[in-house]
């Protein structure tokens, strides 16, 4: 497929020349019942839809997208040839670009013209779709990796032993054995219920906000010349917004995971008892212990994770598009690559900010049976951790964290990217 169309080819698809086409495209919302054609223009519109260029493209769409495309084409054509008594602005939505090769290239060509921009509708349903996709991705990925998350929290909270430089996995194996002896397989899923309640809105807000910030910063899947910094900035802001919303649930989750199951509490009872205990001891501010540390850690993590994934994805799509001589938007990344890019970006971000996460987690879990120590704040926690355990203590739990993060983020991106496809999102 050529990278751009000639003027003759575009003219064969569009019912007018460039300037007239662009001058008549404005943002508006108008139901089909408001389209009023003269008999002659109604025939002309139908002829264009049945013409060889558009008919071939429409035949490649499913029924729903075909109906939507025909509706929007009639809307656009109506603006070019309106009834004298019905002068309105028209709308050309982003759905026109959906997997229709000729029209996709037409729009890309028009958007790059120096004398004006082509305005595309921002469909609100698409915005909701990103949040839904993010929520589903979070639930699936976090449930699959719940045992590793439990191990990570237990290791971070344990201040009684120093990591062994000779046998870095010895502590991990010991903790696994301790958890198994406590309550069998159930011990590895303690806190998973609240984990899901936490991760669903967190992942939903993170991905939804990320897509929104990309649009604000002018980043789209078809833009090739934007600075990579924008992707990292959008990712960092998205993660910070999500962190602010779910931080109280995050604190409660960590405290539950550090609870002693020997008291016979399970399910709702353990959630309610921990919530009441925390509120009685320090009030509502107890739920926000370490929130600034959390945001300081989340911004670089989310920026690295989302920004790196976006960069790897865009780079590889460009390579495949050049190799196969196709438009980049026609390239579909294999699921294996999506998971590999997700695992790499997530692991990189997690390693960079892990010391901050250790401090944050200890501030959140202080005073529990698994972590009885208490701190006066971030600096005090940092000082006591490095004094008692050395700087290696700041990376305590990194091994199970990476074992959890790599598959978790890989699964998350896999589900998210496929959900976007299923919902017809870019």
From Swiss-Prot:
Entries under InterPro entries matching the protein: Mit_carrier, Mitochondrial_sb/sol_carrier, Mt_carrier_dom_sf
Recorded superkingdom: Eukaryota
PROSITE patterns: SOLCAR
Biological process according to GO: ADP transport; ATP transport; mitochondrial ATP transmembrane transport
Pfam families registered for this protein in UniProt: Mito_carr
Keywords linked to the UniProt accession: Membrane, Mitochondrion, Mitochondrion inner membrane, Repeat, Transmembrane, Transmembrane helix, Transport
Record membrane topology: Multi-pass membrane protein
Transmembrane parts of this sequence: 130-151, 193-213, 229-249, 290-310, 336-356, 394-415
Main localization of the protein described in the UniProt heading: mitochondrion
An annotated GO cellular component: mitochondrial inner membrane
GO molecular function: ATP transmembrane transporter activity; ATP:phosphate antiporter activity
Solcar repeat ranges per the UniProt record: 125-216, 226-315, 334-422
Subcellular location: Mitochondrion inner membrane
Family: Belongs to the mitochondrial carrier (TC 2.A.29) family.
PANTHER family xrefs: SOLUTE CARRIER FAMILY 25 (PTHR24089)
Record-given protein name: Uncharacterized mitochondrial carrier C12D12.05c
């Amino acid at each position: 497929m050529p990278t751009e169309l000639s003027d003759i080819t575009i003219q064969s698809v569009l019912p007018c020349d460039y300037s007239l086409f662009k001058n008549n495209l404005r943002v508006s919302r108008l139901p089909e019942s408001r389209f009023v054609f003269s008999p002659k223009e109604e025939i002309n519109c139908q002829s264009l839809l049945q013409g060889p260029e558009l008919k071939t493209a429409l035949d490649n769409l499913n029924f729903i997208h075909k109906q939507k495309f025909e509706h929007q084409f009639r809307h656009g054509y109506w603006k070019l040839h309106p009834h004298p008594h019905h002068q309105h602005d028209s709308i050309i939505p982003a759905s026109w670009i959906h997997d229709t090769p000729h029209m996709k290239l037409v729009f890309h060509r028009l958007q790059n013209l120096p004398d004006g921009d082509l305005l595309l509708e921002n469909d609100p349903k698409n915005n909701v779709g990103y949040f839904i996709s993010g929520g589903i991705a979070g639930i699936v990925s976090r449930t699959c990796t719940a045992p590793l998350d439990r191990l990570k929290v237990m290791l971070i909270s344990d201040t009684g032993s120093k990591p062994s430089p000779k046998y870095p996995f010895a502590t991990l194996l010991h903790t696994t054995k301790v958890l198994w002896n406590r309550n069998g397989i159930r011990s590895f899923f303690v806190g998973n219920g609240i984990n899901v309640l936490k991760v669903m809105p967190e992942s939903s807000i993170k991905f939804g906000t990320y897509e929104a910030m990309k649009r604000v910063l002018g980043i789209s899947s078809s833009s090739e010349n934007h600075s990579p910094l924008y992707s990292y900035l959008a990712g960092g802001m998205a993660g910070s917004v999500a962190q602010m919303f779910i931080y109280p649930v995050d604190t409660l989750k960590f405290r539950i995971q550090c609870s002693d199951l020997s008291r016979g509490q399970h399910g709702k009872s353990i959630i309610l008892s921990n919530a009441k205990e925390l509120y009685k001891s320090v009030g509502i501010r107890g739920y926000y212990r370490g929130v600034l540390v959390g945001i300081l850690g989340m911004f670089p993590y989310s920026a690295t994770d989302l920004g790196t994934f976006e960069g790897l994805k865009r780079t590889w799509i460009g390579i495949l598009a050049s190799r196969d001589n196709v438009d980049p938007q026609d390239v579909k990344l294999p699921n294996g690559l999506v998971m590999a890019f997700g695992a790499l970006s997530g692991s990189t971000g997690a390693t960079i900010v892990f010391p901050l996460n250790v401090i944050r987690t200890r501030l959140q879990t202080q005073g529990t049976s698994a972590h009885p120590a208490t701190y006066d704040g971030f600096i005090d926690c940092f000082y006591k951790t490095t004094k008692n355990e050395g700087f290696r203590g700041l990376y305590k739990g990194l091994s199970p964290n990476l074992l959890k993060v790599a598959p978790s983020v890989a699964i998350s991106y896999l589900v998210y990217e496929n959900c976007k496809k299923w919902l017809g999102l870019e």
